């Protein structure tokens, strides 16, 4: 049971956490994977190499410590993380393993400060939060299993179509091998896909945004070939592009995600860059089915060859009479602006519009800064980060 004394002790350890920084979570992951290598089948090891996951986990732990006396402030974070966990098929027993290694990490990095009262407080705090996640994730699993076309664990799907969308993005249309219905989803959500690439010692699970409106029959994901020309090419994305063919099978976990279009009587502005167009495409198709008016689509990429869904989007926008503006950073073209996206030059629904963002973190930070400067209410800015979460604005 989490007591007031525990809360007081946790808050007193905040300076210790802040002084340790992400080194704490780096040590935690190294320890956990050393003792429990089977978890490498679940965690994205690429994010371990880049350090993004360590930073994201540290920020989550620090936020929990700071808000442990006001857990309502963490509601949105809990929902986001719970959805992501279900796309990895996280189970209650995993929390026991994580808790053990987190507590041992604190003991090893701060042996003098990790007194018995501190250990008891962090043990109570961790397992209190773990139960919050277990309960929420259990509810999500049950809800999806009981819904039409739903399922609980992995389900086998077959690649029905494979379509090149741009220089680095290819779409895969996936249908269930059992011939049954598929679970509906909200436009903007993602699915977890599990594969075992050639040369990999582990099963690999990745999340990809669904890029078409829900129809109860099939899913479409649109995958960017990551790290082209780099020393660290995307393991799963390259495997999907190079090896997975029409007729091949993959395992999917049910649609998840707390970023999605919410129907309101407001104008809608969709802003994306690069492969960030994928969830926006699902939203666009959904808005078209609703005959939604007052939609603005803003998109940026490097060049025409990297313009994902160019024709598909143009057709939708022309049919619906919506507004579109595109920027190419490296070249000019008809009806396309060159350079960086400049929102002040456009007529936008600043006072009442809902703004949905997706793309590289630097791009979204740049856009959010502009939106806030223009007077857009922060509550009307919604965004999706591919990979470990990051804050875009204070």
Curated annotation (Swiss-Prot):
Q: What is its EC number?
A: 1.14.12.17
Q: Does the keyword Iron apply?
A: yes
Boundaries of each FAD-binding FR-type domain copy? 152-262
Asked if Flavoprotein is a keyword of the record, the answer is: yes
Cofactor(s) this protein requires: heme b; FAD
Q: Which PROSITE patterns match?
A: FAD_FR, GLOBIN
What the entry lists under Pfam families is as follows: FAD_binding_6, Globin, NAD_binding_1
Alphabetical GO CC annotations of the entry are: cytoplasm
Catalytic residues per the record? Answer: 95 (charge relay system), 137 (charge relay system)
Q: Which UniProt keywords apply?
A: Detoxification, FAD, Flavoprotein, Heme, Iron, Metal-binding, NAD, NADP, Oxidoreductase, Oxygen transport, Transport
Q: Which top-rank group of organisms is this from?
A: Bacteria
Q: Which residues bind NADP(+)?
A: 274-279
In chain numbering, the residues marked as site (Involved in heme-bound ligand stabilization and O-O bond activation) are 29
The UniProt note on the cofactor reads as follows: Binds 1 heme b (iron(II)-protoporphyrin IX) group per subunit. Binds 1 FAD per subunit.
What is the documented function of this protein? Is involved in NO detoxification in an aerobic process, termed nitric oxide dioxygenase (NOD) reaction that utilizes O(2) and NAD(P)H to convert NO to nitrate, which protects the bacterium from various noxious nitrogen compounds. Therefore, plays a central role in the inducible response to nitrosative stress.
Q: What is known of its domains?
A: Consists of two distinct domains; an N-terminal heme-containing oxygen-binding domain and a C-terminal reductase domain with binding sites for FAD and NAD(P)H.
Know the name of this protein? Flavohemoprotein
Q: Which organism is it from?
A: Vibrio cholerae serotype O1 (strain ATCC 39315 / El Tor Inaba N16961)
Taxonomically, what lineage is the organism? Bacteria, Pseudomonadati, Pseudomonadota, Gammaproteobacteria, Vibrionales
